[in-house]
Swiss-Prot record:
The lineage of its organism: Archaea, Thermoproteota, Thermoprotei, Sulfolobales, Sulfolobaceae. It catalyses: sn-glycerol 1-phosphate + NAD(+) = dihydroxyacetone phosphate + NADH + H(+); sn-glycerol 1-phosphate + NADP(+) = dihydroxyacetone phosphate + NADPH + H(+). It comes from Sulfolobus acidocaldarius (strain ATCC 33909 / DSM 639 / JCM 8929 / NBRC 15157 / NCIMB 11770). This is Glycerol-1-phosphate dehydrogenase [NAD(P)+]. One of its GO terms (molecular function) is metal ion binding. It holds the Pfam family Fe-ADH_2.
Amino acid sequence: MEIKEHIINLPKHIYTGYGILDNFRNYLQTLNLPQPFLVITGPVIHQEIFSKRIEEHIKDFKYEVVIVNKSDLSEAEKVEDIARQKGIKTILGVGGGTVIDIAKFTAYKIDREFISIPTSPSHDGITSPFAAIKGLGKPISIKAKEPLAIISDVEILASAPRRLINAGIGDTLGKITAVRDWRLAHKLRGEYYGDYTASLALMSARHALSCTKIINKDIRAGVRVLTEALISSGVAMGMAGSTRPASGSEHLFAHAIELLYPNLGLHGELVALGTIMMAYIHGINWRRIRRAMKKIGLPVTSKQIGIPDEGIIKALTIAHSIRPERYTILGDRGLTWESAEKIARETGVIS
């Protein structure tokens, strides 16, 4: 099969470990980044992490700080304007998913290097060259800048709220069904499929399953495993040149819920819930996935997230239309109401 050329841009440096923010200055010197920097962060992270753990290591560099509160188009445009006005040469994203998305999208828009400094392991966006920016019509990921380097301090990540950590596990479990959907699209539609990239994504999912076995006993060890899984998943997307290895029917379901109920459930929670049902359709051992989720406290029912049963069914019936060009197990026509209800009930997502 003839494959269209795509350029694979991967992180050149990945720093991970306990307490490594103490080496922040050394990392910046090693990377030899052009200045001035634009540090993009959130209000809480600025106060609790940047001011206390990073600022002293960056004081000899030229930099500006901008605080963001949301990941939407208006916020992204505001940050882009600031970056252009200040003549910014390098973008540093210090925060969770919202901050990282804005940072790498800004870096992409102004064509600058991006350094990812995650403070919560809530999804695989810490590494991937894609960002979830609201206000673009549909809640899907768009092209962004891949990180030149990732600085992931496991001590900081392990101190994130447990719900965010669980969401990261949930997002990573979704690779189980995403890769199956990718294989299906290759078989039925002739879509490009990369064995190595798919294997990398599946390895991330296996790491997430391993994480569910240890994280209740040892949060640091569990988060270390999760962080490696999230990084691997992001790298898989970079190699594929798309989100295909990491996003399939389970993500389409999550995006459908996000459209119907914008403020209910974290992204990773919704992906995990979708993974249970899509695994059922694929004939994968969905009970194992559900047990792993339940063990760590991830929601396994619509009631736990606050979504009405009919909302789950509705999301299942419209999920295929979120990205019509992305073929999945849901097919071109999607699920009927009756089929969707049967799937949701038999997997225990609704009662």
